[in-house]
């Protein structure tokens, strides 16, 4: 439900903040483009908008895994989402 999505988005915001601080010098411009989007997620009021943007975060995590993170480090977060 929507409350669960919001809780999950809050977790992702915290987690991504940690990732950004660790890999700030490594992330390329394309990945940095998602930072502002993640910051806006709390403002979405509809389930569809939240889910659409959650999919963008999932895409970002895949890019991070392929570029700067150990494989599978975040996969378990998404097993039950989609």
Predicted regions and their residues:
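AAA+ P-loop NTPase domains with strong preference for DNA replication initiators
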Residues: 1-48, 52-66, 73-82
